[in-house]
């Protein structure tokens, strides 16, 4: 009981009401239960959306924000890159971990869908951490491991590209330049005190200009944007497959006209806001 643990009636009343306790009281309870104090409490995120995602992820709540973010972002991000899975099929995989193989879906599309679910989990788990090369490489590895790409030694799953590539006819950083360019990009970005959604969009565009990986750059870039929005208490954006022509135009024209990509990402933020409204989650 509370008195056996050496707690005052006032402290017991606080526990009953779910109010905050002092460190001294927590240590007393932990000592009585013979457990570490940190096992009795958890740190809550300042970002309400991030905390909701973590709470729902922990209990695998169906039909909430976490559930819908997983399905909608995974479907749209993968479909933009050529996945043949429909949104309904993506939802089925998330909800039941099964799919009708009679649909003729490539195995890699299924694998990369499951991997994308785990990559979103990772972004939610480490949202507050400083963005690093290691985090970015891990996101690529999470997406591409065990796919057919791992059969090619030059593909370098989980590492920077070994072969030069072009995107939409546009030159990207050469393999010998990628590490230098990524370090410079991260140094500039992490030096900012108050990150805005425009800063995150700029990072996203410059990341795509570097195109550091052999494949998976777009999905990794959009996952980074999710993580950084959650870190900086900014409503995330989901680029819908139906808007991909505007999105790709915005990326290709970024260094000449920034407004196209910014407008497309803000439209994606409106998509997320609509989801918050449907679920009656307050937002600013």
Model-predicted regions and their roles:
Residues 1-3:
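Short alpha-helical "recognition helix" segments of helix-turn-helix
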Residues 24-39:
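DNA major-groove recognition helix of helix-turn-helix/homeodomain DNA-binding modules
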Residues 42-284:
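FIC/Doc superfamily catalytic core
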Residues 6-21:
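Recognition helix of helix-turn-helix/homeodomain-like DNA-binding domains
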């Amino acid at each position: 009981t509370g008195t056996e643990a050496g707690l005052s009636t006032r402290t017991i009343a606080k526990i009953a009401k779910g109010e905050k306790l002092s460190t001294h009281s927590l240590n007393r309870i932990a000592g009585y239960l013979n457990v570490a104090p940190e096992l009795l409490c958890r740190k809550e995120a300042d970002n309400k959306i991030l905390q909701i995602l973590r709470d729902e992820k922990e209990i695998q709540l169906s039909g909430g924000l976490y559930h819908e973010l997983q399905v909608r972002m995974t479907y749209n991000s993968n479909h933009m890159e050529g996945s043949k899975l429909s949104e309904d099929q993506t939802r089925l995989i998330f909800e039941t971990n099964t799919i009708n193989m009679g649909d003729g879906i490539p195995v890699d599309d299924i694998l990369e869908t499951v991997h994308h679910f785990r990559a979103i989990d990772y972004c939610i788990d480490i949202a507050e951490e400083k963005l690093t090369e290691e985090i970015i490489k891990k996101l690529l590895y999470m997406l591409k491991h065990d796919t057919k790409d791992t059969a090619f030694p030059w593909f370098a799953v989980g590492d920077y590209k070994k072969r030069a590539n072009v995107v939409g006819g546009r030159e990207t950083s050469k393999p010998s330049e990628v590490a230098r360019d990524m370090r410079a990009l991260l140094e500039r970005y992490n030096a900012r005190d108050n990150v805005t959604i425009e800063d995150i969009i700029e990072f996203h565009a410059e990341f795509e200009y570097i195109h550091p990986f052999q494949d998976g750059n777009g999905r990794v870039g959009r996952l980074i944007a999710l993580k950084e929005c959650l870190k900086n208490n900014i409503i995330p954006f989901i680029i819908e497959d139906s808007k991909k022509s505007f999105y790709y135009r915005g990326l290709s024209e970024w260094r000449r006209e920034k407004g196209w990509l910014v407008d497309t990402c803000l439209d994606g933020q409106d998509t997320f806001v609509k989801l918050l409204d449907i679920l009656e989650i307050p937002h600013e």
